[in-house]
Amino acid sequence: MSVRDGVPLAADTADVWLGKAVVHLAAACGVPASALDDLTKPALGGTRLAPGARAFLVRLDESRLCVLCAALAAEATVNDYIHSRRPSYRGMLDKLSVPEKFSLAPRLLSGADLFPPGSRVYEHLVRLFALQRELVQAWPHPAAPGDPADGGQSERFNPRIAHELLESVARGAKALGDLHEHPYRPTVGLALKVVDALAKRAEAAAAVPAPTVAELEEEEETLTAAAFAEEMIGA
């Protein structure tokens, strides 16, 4: 089963959110769901991003959705690890933040110091959950015509950042899975292949400058006029 088809019903919650995060990351890089299978093949075409302000904002939305789903995948992953190793520890460890769980749980339950504070995965998890909090606490703000149409969010939620954070979540999930006698969750391996294949696309998508409010309004006026003209011709 491919990533774009989702995951089997028997898969755990972590796999569901990880799969969704991968799909949103691909969309943020301008890759449609129908092309996900091809990403894991050696021969890949060049990156093609749809032009325009609206397309930019769609990719930004997909980056934000990737961040939200990656955070849910990370939390479900470490909770699944704790429950599978020592269910009686859940109450104690539930008092910790998700990055703290990733750091402490492997040491406590498996004697493995995988994600100490300062490590790449740990620091990316801290950043991931800071961004998640920012998204769920967002407030609208007035913008002038020359201001970025995204309110400056592409500086924090662009495809490159979403890619980095999702990669760390997937690698963290793989490391926790490898602590078992038989590594579990094959979806993690597939997700890592797709994430690796999206690296250059994420960089290219993140390099596109944010449109201004005026540019977005001009594009919307043009599209509205074109739609009206098409309707009149067809009448």
Regions picked out by a protein language model, each given a short descriptive name:
Residues 19, 26, 30, 68-71, ...:
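A broad detector of short, well-ordered amphipathic alpha-helices
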Residues 75-152, 162-175:
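Flexible secondary-structure boundary motifs
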Residues 55-65, 117-120, 154-157, 161:
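Non-transmembrane, amphipathic alpha-helical segments
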Residues 59-83:
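Short, hydrophobic, well-ordered secondary-structure elements
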Residues 1-63:
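Charged alpha-helical initiation segments
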Residues 2-12, 71-76, 103-104:
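Short N-terminal helix-initiation segments at or just after the protein's N-terminus
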Residues 10, 17, 62, 69, ...:
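Amphipathic alpha-helix face/heptad-repeat signature
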Residues 16, 32-46, 124, 141-235:
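Polyanionic, low-complexity intrinsically disordered segments
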